[in-house]
Each structure stands twice: as C-alpha cells, then as structure tokens.
C-alpha cells in the first residue's frame, strides 16, 4: 500500500522510514542513477491551487521550511494566507496582472510522498516572473525539480524560471512522468 506523507504520528513516521528502507534495499549496488530512477516510476502530478485548497497548511509549511530546494529563497511570514495569495492567484485583486500557482504531488513505485512542491508565477504584460519554485527534501535526488523546471519553461517561458534554477534545465529528468491536473 502507498504511504501518505503528512503530519506524522509515530506509526506514520515509521511507515515513512519503511518506504525509504524499501527504496534503499531495492537499489542494486552497480545500478546507475538513471536506471534506478526509471525503475522507481516517479510520477509528479501538478494541480492548480484552488481558493479552497485542502493542502493550504502544507503549502505554507513547505514555503516556510524549505531551504536547499527553495530556488526563489522567498519565505512568506506566518500571516501569509495561501488561499488569498496563492489559492486565488488568478483573480487576486491587490496586484495587477495574471497570477498562477500549482502544487506538486509525487508518488513512485515505493510509496506516496504527498505535496512536495509549490510553483507560482505572476505576469504583467508579456513576461512571467517567478514567485515560488520550492520543493521538499522528500523528493531530493528524484529529479522532480528538474522535470518541473522543464515543464514550467515549456508552459510559461524562461522568464518564469528563477535564475537559481536555470541549471536544472541541463539535468536529465526523463525518469519523471509529469501529469497535469488543472
């Protein structure tokens, strides 16, 4: 059975470690990264953040706590409301232009990792600019960030990708399947 990631109790925490243990044991010592990642069957589902999104608390937590995989280094303060700012991004009234926000949910052959990413951009005129491009360490090494970088550039253009994430475009993320649910 897939294991969901969230606010853990002791059993859930143990289940998380069991997923990682199974994944570690499944890796062959001589197996290259690309081959192992393909065998993992990684799926990243990208969904628009809705004004009534049930994952709002997780999205705020992710933006506040992520360090290494926070490519914009933008952290909202504790009063930031994802439902007002990100959830209703397309119709947010206090700023001109179009805004868009997605959450990223990841699963692979070993389990479900839950919401592991927030990708957001805003547009005034023709150019998009990055607002958030942040991922949890739960997906570190899975190349989900590289797959999302390529997807974002294809969808909105290079101006939507943070400068710190441009190097991801050179990473082979072909082992990650992107599913868009918006």
Predicted feature locations:
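Acyl-donor binding region in acyl/amide transferases
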Residues: 108-109, 115-182
């Amino acid at each position: 059975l897939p294991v969901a990631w969230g606010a853990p109790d002791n059993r859930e925490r143990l289940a998380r470690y069991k997923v990682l243990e199974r994944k570690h044991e499944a890796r062959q010592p001589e197996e290259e990264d690309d081959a192992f990642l393909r065998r993992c069957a990684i799926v990243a589902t990208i969904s628009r953040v809705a004004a009534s999104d049930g994952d709002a608390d997780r999205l705020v937590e992710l933006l506040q706590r992520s360090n290494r995989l926070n490519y914009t280094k933008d952290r909202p303060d504790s009063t930031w409301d994802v439902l007002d700012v990100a959830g209703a991004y397309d119709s947010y009234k206090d700023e001109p232009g179009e805004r868009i926000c997605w959450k990223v949910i990841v699963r692979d052959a070993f389990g479900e990792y839950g919401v592991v990413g927030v990708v957001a951009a805003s547009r005034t005129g023709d150019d998009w600019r990055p607002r958030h491009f942040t991922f949890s360490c739960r997906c570190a090494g899975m190349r989900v960030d590289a797959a999302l970088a390529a997807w974002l550039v294809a969808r909105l253009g290079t101006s939507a990708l943070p400068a710190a994430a441009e190097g991801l475009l050179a990473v082979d993320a072909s082992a990650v399947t992107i599913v868009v649910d918006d």
